[in-house]
Amino acid sequence: MFPLEEITPNTCSGYRDQRGHTLLYNILSGRASGYLNTKLNHNTTAHNCRCEQRRTVCLKDPKATCQVASSVLVKTIHFVRSLPSFNQLPSGDQSSLLRHCWVPLFVLGLAQEKIAFEVTDAPNSSILRQILLGPGLTEKEAERPTLAGVHSLRTCLHYLWNLDLSPKEYAYLKGALLFNPAVQGLSASLFIVGLQQEAQRALHEVIHLLHPEDNFRFSNVLKAASAVQTVGHSLVTELFFKPVIGNTNMLHLLTEMLFVQ
């Protein structure tokens, strides 16, 4: 099962609320992210015109920021590989789970390490160009990071920073997001259901232990779990890793990092 003792000791075992399990399962599986995604988009675009939000952007200091982002990704893969229960899964399931959840885990890593970044207009990007090209944008251009996407990512990060999660809370939240039985094509889905339930139980318990007077913290952490799943894979890849890996396939790179000793 999920190696609770590998991540943090001294958790109690009183939580058995199946309704909470169902709610958290839906959120962690990405099924309840629509509401928060709409709320995030409203917050980030309420005071900005649509054409402004479509502006394509890039990192202001790509060398330094990409180096930090790469370090966060390496730590993320190390966390995943360090879980004995993850290593017990078939290699195909391991690959599928990582491909599905690497962005939420990476965003949690950015938040945990308090990584801030600045962006600037991408070369050859202008509001007029975005308006004129509109639906005629090529696939490559459409994948470029937009100001709206960066705003959404920053909103997620600030939400997590305001929660000020402990290392234990981050660890269990990562575990609950990693073991997602809703991922298509899993051969050990029932086992993964148990792993996610154990992770979410431990998350609830550690929140109760660390914040016994905060009755809303658990639900706020659930909102954070939903928020990180709204961040697009292409945004993270293009913004933080494309300047380094070029045309290398990001999913292939992740698979190599996972299985190469």
Each language-model region and where it sits:
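Intrinsically disordered, low-complexity regulatory regions enriched in Ser/Pro/Thr/Gln
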Residues: 1-261
